[in-house]
Amino acid sequence: MYKGWDSEALSIQSEIVNEILLYCYLTPQPPIPSETTTATSPTNIENEISNLESSENLEELKRLSVALNIDRRCNICSIVNLCLKQNKSWIYDYSLLCYKCNYAPKTPLSLLIVSAEFIMLIRERFPNINFDGLFQNNIVSIFDFHVHFFIHRCFANTVNDHIQSENITLNHMAIIRSTLLKEDSIPHIKIKKFLTKKMNPKKTQSPELNKKLTVPMKTRFTTLLFYMWSGTNVFDRVPFTDLTIRKHRFIKNLYSNKTDIELTAGPILLAQIPFSITKNKTTSVCLLCELMAASKQDYLFLKYLHQSIMDYCQNNLKMIDRVQFVIADIFEKTKIHMHVKNLSDYSKAIFDNEFSFSDDNFTLDTHVYLILRQTGTVGVYKHFFCDPLCLANCKTINPEVLFNTTDAGEIQDLKVTICYRNEYLSIVEKHVWLAIHLFKAFQIIKPNHKNKTQIAEFLKDFTNLLALHHFDIVDPIFTVNYYV
């Protein structure tokens, strides 16, 4: 019985999971020798971008970007149509998947879960149809899932302004394609028109449906989270040597036409901006957004952490100091750092996860401790107070939908109700997501005179747009220059 967002069905041994991960790695080209670059050169964003440009397979990138054309059919919609011709009742499971996706944060982990569950649903329900080799045979790419479930949201309610919706999707695609192909500029998208967009009150929740989801699931994806980003710069301060070796061995043993993968970048094509970079102790993949999508326990801890920072004291401390003091207090209270000391490999600590602290306010175990250790004070500060994508994810997620189900005897009725009510509501407006996507692209682009002018023009309107939609955030001018 399909329940959605079920970690028991998607373990790190899952062939579907590992197949998706494999095809979300980029294939490197042989490195190009350079007399000006040495092994001891200081690492900065300009050097990293330059190195990436010379190492990635441009032919593969061009092939992947085919899915980012507005006049190309949606391959996921085509598969859905094929499945419905075989068995119309299949749409009920698909509707539950879409409903859960609707309240999921836009993170690589969320996209991996949605993609894996979709493939699992079609393979298990239609064994007479050959759905093997979807990625290997270029039937789909991960960008088909990006567009279908998180950008255009093909399953969602019909909007009145079809052309504006089409143009927003077109702009999203252009942003991804320009960053994927490492172009020198970002598409010039004017967001000022969204400031005059009429703000009509709209429904953002389905309380009648949501109240049916009352049974907590024992779902938790933190092990998968460590697995997918082990051996990458996302975990550059917390090594997982054995876990990384296991992952690389597993995905390389899959039958595939990929002969080599860019290991340190990880499955970066799962990210909203498919570009692996670090800057000022932040990475282009936010682990705290990933953690939100992992379980209700982890979501509630992050909610407690944020409230503790806000309530820390009545004095006018800077937010970064509040973050540092609160995390130090939590570590001192939980004592997990006493058991999980400096190790050369934390893989065993992940699988054992034997140390945990819980009280009336929060639960913290080895998994969360290691993620906080990796993100550090700056990463927590950026997530809660600086990054508009993180804040949009916080607004979007509904843990009661993602991590709950209903009684076994009622779940089919729930799926039917979801299907016929067709309420896939957008919490954050589609044009706001576009503006945030553009902001994230500006964070990683190589600076030049043209880009600086474009960024300055964009930020003026972006700041006003965030205020209009009640995004209480540190000045984006700071964030766009200092973090990724």
UniProtKB/Swiss-Prot annotation:
InterPro entries in the cross-refs: Herpes_env
Residues at which Zn(2+) 1 binds: 74, 77, 148, 154
Protein's cellular compartments: Host cytoplasm; Host nucleus
One Pfam entry name: Herpes_env
One annotated Gene Ontology cellular component of this protein: host cell nucleus
Main localization, broad class: host cell
Region spans: Zinc finger 1: 74-154
Residues annotated as binding Zn(2+) 2: 286, 289, 383, 390
Keywords of this entry: Host cytoplasm, Host nucleus, Metal-binding, Zinc, Zinc-finger
Protein name per UniProt: Packaging protein UL32 homolog
Native source species: Human herpesvirus 6B (strain Z29)
Lineage of the organism: Viruses, Duplodnaviria, Heunggongvirae, Peploviricota, Herviviricetes
